[in-house]
Amino acid sequence: MSEVKSRKKSGTKGAPAEPGKRNEGGKSPEARGGGGRGWADPRTGVSLLSLGTCLGLAWFVFQQSEKFAKVENQYQLLKMETSEFQGLQSKISLISEKCQKSEAIIEQLKAFQIITHLKHLQEEIYEVKTWSSRISEKQDILNNNLTTVSQDVAKADQSTTSMAKDIGLKITTIKTDIRRMSGLVTDVTSLTDSVQELENKIEKVEKNTVKNIGDLLSSSIDRTAMLRKTASENSQRINSVKKILSELQGDFNKHTDRLLSLESDRAKVLKTVTFANDLKPKVYNLKKDFSRLEPLVNDLTLRIGRLVTDLQQREKEIAFLKEKISNLTTVRAEIKDMKDEIKHISDMD
């Protein structure tokens, strides 16, 4: 518009400067002025057209910028969705790894065959309980035998005091009998040593059970075999004790018969009486040792019961693990369904 105005001004200024040309053309200045206005009108039209095109272009650029902003927002949203989808994929991969690990653990548990081992262990524990009950019954029988032996010793004491005059003629036989009695005393001491060894073995077994309770499932068969061996050894020792007691009873009967025939040398008889009195505390100590054995056997049975309860708890834990694994399989199926839905949505987009 400014160019058009400047051109109009230049046209008006140039009109009086050329009078000769006016006369030559034969036209009036009014006609000339009309021609200048006609020359300026197309320029204004062109400028208006250019102005309209500029406005159209500006409007087009504005619309394009709005569309570009919308596209950029959609791109940011897509970026967020892809990051969330990647996080979901990582979580799904972690869950699938956990499922694979749990399946491997289940296969390992199946390979170990824990249930069969547990059944074998329960059967062997029942057998050990029966062995312990038999041992307790044999101990009761031994206690009764010991009471009868003590009563026989008391009767022997009374008979020795009444028959003190009959010993003078058979001192040599008494010496040999005393030697035999000393041999029996050594047998009794060896028996006490064996009982002590048995107690030490029981303590060792207890320590081993406390230390190796984690490896109980793998080494239960060997331990039950060792327990059977020790129980059989105990029964053999009890049988040997019974034999020794029967021999003692036979020797006591022989001595009572011989003491009835002895009638002299009262001092030596008193020595034999003191020897019999020395035997009494040893027999009493034997009773004490057997009474100490009873609580140990009871403690063993209690510990076996605790082992049974621990095994039942482990069975419950295994059942709980199975439930968890079934839940994991259902979760895995749901995750697969989610993956399929996400793939379907991505295909739709």
Swiss-Prot record:
Subcellular location: Endoplasmic reticulum membrane
TM stretches of this protein: 45-61
Coiled coil: 183-216, 304-347
Bias type Basic residues, positions: 1-11
UniProt keyword list: Coiled coil, Endoplasmic reticulum, Glycoprotein, Membrane, Transmembrane, Transmembrane helix
InterPro entries, per the entry: Inh_kappa-B_kinase-int
Keyword 4Fe-4S: no
Region described as Disordered: 1-39
Ranges of Basic and acidic residues composition bias in the record: 19-30
Posttranslational modification: N-glycosylated.
Glycosylation sites: 145, 327
Membrane protein topology class: Single-pass membrane protein
CC annotations in GO: endoplasmic reticulum membrane
Note in the entry: Shares a common promoter with APAF1 from which the 2 genes are transcribed in opposite directions.
Function: Target of p53/TP53 with pro-apoptotic function.
Name the UniProt record assigns to this protein: Inhibitor of nuclear factor kappa-B kinase-interacting protein
Organism name: Bos taurus
Gene coding for it: IKBIP
